[in-house]
């Protein structure tokens, strides 16, 4: 909406966004750097959080009839890319999850016997089906950051896979 508000060039691809948003599926977009992934994610965020409010005058306005407002969490993994050990990465990832999911009702209890990831997965189970949209940007940032550091790369990859597997059935 800011692009259009300031008369910047904006190519309306919201008809394609409608096609994707109309299906209850998980999508993984791999595109080159500077290829519009963040703008695409922001458009989805606006659609699922506010409906058509910020998309008036675009193709999607005449197509999208769903008036449901969703809980929307946007995770930007570039916020967790500076670390020197697997433990530090795990802490940064946990902080990213707590910070972003607390905006939609997740409450982490520090000092509890249960880990952050366990508490988070238990909280996810309490949500109504199809009530949460999770958008991930810069998913590869932590891995790119530690390229060339074989052991650290493997540990970060495993942590990301474990976290995504734990959440996969719940989201």
Ranges and model annotations:
Residues 1-35, 39-48, 52-62:
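Walker A/P-loop-proximal flanking segment of P-loop NTPase domains
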Residues 22-23, 68-69, 127-130:
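Short loop/turn elements that form and flank the Walker-type P-loop nucleotide-binding site
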Residues 31, 35, 39-47, 88-100, ...:
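Alpha-helical scaffold elements adjacent to nucleotide-binding pockets in ATP/GTP-utilizing enzyme cores
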Residues 58-99:
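P-loop NTPase motor core
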Residues 100-136, 140, 155-157:
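Mid-core helix/loop region of P-loop NTP-binding domains shared across ATPases and GTPases
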Residues 141-144, 169:
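Residues immediately C-terminal
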Residues 143-153:
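Conserved ATPase-coupling elements of RecA-like P-loop NTPase cores
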Residues 162-171:
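Single conserved hydrophobic/aromatic residue that forms the stacking wall/gate
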């Amino acid at each position: 909406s800011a692009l259009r508000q300031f008369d910047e060039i904006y190519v309306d691809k919201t008809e394609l966004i409608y096609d994707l948003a109309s299906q209850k599926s998980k999508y993984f977009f791999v595109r080159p750097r500077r290829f519009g992934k963040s703008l695409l994610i922001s458009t989805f965020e606006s659609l699922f959080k506010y409906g058509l409010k910020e998309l008036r005058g675009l193709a999607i306005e005449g197509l999208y009839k769903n008036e449901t407002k969703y809980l929307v969490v946007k995770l930007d993994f570039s916020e967790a890319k500076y670390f020197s050990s697997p433990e530090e990465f795990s802490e940064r990832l946990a902080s990213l999850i707590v910070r972003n999911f607390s905006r939609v009702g997740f409450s982490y209890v520090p000092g509890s016997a249960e880990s952050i990831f366990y508490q988070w997965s238990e909280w996810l189970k309490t949500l109504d089906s199809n009530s949460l949209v999770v958008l991930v940007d810069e998913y590869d940032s932590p891995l790119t950051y530690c390229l060339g550091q074989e052991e650290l790369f493997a540990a970060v990859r495993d942590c990301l896979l474990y976290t995504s597997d734990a959440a996969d059935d719940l989201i």
